[in-house]
């Protein structure tokens, strides 16, 4: 074949977005098992609900833990795909915050699965969840700034950046925040990454490569 062919390469943005969306959906499905327990105010009623649905509850916590652990992987891949510069630095910082915070929530989910009474009555220290939430909010702030410097559409970065102070105010005021809001924003970012049309990469044909002195497999 003569001339040049345009290839899309490895599509790193789209692959990163796929991981983020799939992991966020996994988290959402898992956390929805016995989902009404999160809206139930009475501890005794929460415990009774969990005891009636112990199997689905435990399975849901494992699914949510898998999603929690996998979401940061997608953002690590996104950061790796960016060219060196401020956007990459900010995205790397966001990914690092997510990686640091994920184990805290995974441990909390494992605790929920193993001790129904403790979760129903909201016993135990609050610092792991507060730290996880704080890291997540910091990650969204850095991610939003990084996205605004990336080739993606501006609304993606604006959404992430604007959510950070809003979520921070909620967390500071109530000492609590539903984690699904984090994954909703991140899934939206992932969906935009999946839709991003990455520039085609020109590839030299055999004759061109020979003239340029490039090696062939």
Enumerate the language-model features and the residues they cover.
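Hydrophobic, aromatic-enriched alpha-helical segments typical of multi-pass transmembrane helices
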Residues: 2-217
């Amino acid at each position: 074949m003569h001339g040049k062919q345009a290839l899309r390469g490895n599509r790193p943005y789209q692959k990163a977005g796929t991981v983020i969306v799939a992991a966020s959906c996994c988290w959402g499905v898992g956390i929805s098992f016995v989902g009404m327990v999160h809206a139930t105010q009475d501890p005794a009623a929460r415990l009774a609900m969990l005891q009636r649905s112990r199997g689905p509850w435990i399975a849901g916590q494992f699914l949510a833990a898998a999603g929690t652990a996998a979401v940061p992987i997608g953002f690590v891949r996104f950061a790796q795909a960016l060219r060196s510069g401020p956007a990459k630095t900010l995205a790397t910082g966001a990914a690092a915050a997510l990686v640091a915070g994920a184990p805290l929530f995974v441990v909390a989910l494992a605790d929920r699965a193993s001790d129904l009474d403790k979760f129903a009555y909201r016993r135990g220290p609050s610092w792991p969840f507060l730290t996880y939430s704080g890291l997540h909010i910091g990650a969204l702030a850095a991610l939003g700034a990084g996205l605004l410097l990336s080739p993606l559409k501006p609304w993606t970065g604006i959404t992430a950046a604007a959510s950070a102070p809003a979520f921070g105010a909620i967390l500071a005021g109530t000492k609590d925040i539903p984690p699904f809001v984090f994954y909703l924003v991140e899934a939206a970012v992932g969906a935009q990454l999946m839709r991003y049309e990455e520039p085609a990469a020109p590839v030299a044909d055999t004759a061109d490569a020979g003239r340029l002195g490039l090696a062939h497999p």
